[in-house]
Amino acid sequence: MEQIKEQLTDIKSMNMDELTEFIISLGEKKFRAKQIYEWIHVKHVDSFDEMTNISKKFIQVLKDNAILISLKKEEVQVSKLDGTRKYLFALDDGNVIESVLMKYKHGNSVCISSQVGCRMGCRFCASTLDGLVRGLRPSEMIDQIYQIGKDIGERISNVVVM
């Protein structure tokens, strides 16, 4: 299954121009790209089936040619001290990453992972145990923000990349 996924186009990682070009290459009109972009980056849907203003026929074309990366929330730990939330997300390839939400008076800040593992070798950090495995796709980084925002039902105002 992983080999099949690698052949599909990761549309959450695309900017608007790239998405427009891709949608046109699939035989659809240009305006569809804007609709799909809004479903992904404004409404934060996790599957093509949630895109209710896209025809079922074109949804199937998308499923045949693209992948919509959506992280799976495995665990959330909440600090009793200050309410900080640590998230563990599973990636499609079986790896896991961590993200952290910190709530402040001025807004919600998240620290997102940019890679699986780390080569720094810090003794206190579990991320370094297996070394650096790989960098994350843009979609995997973006979806950390989207999933945390959906989890708390609030806007994320600041992002720190780890």
Positions of PLM-derived features:
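Flexible, acidic/Gly-rich N-terminal and inter-domain linker regions that tether
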Residues: M1-N108
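Conserved Radical SAM active-site core
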Residues: I97-S114, R119-M162
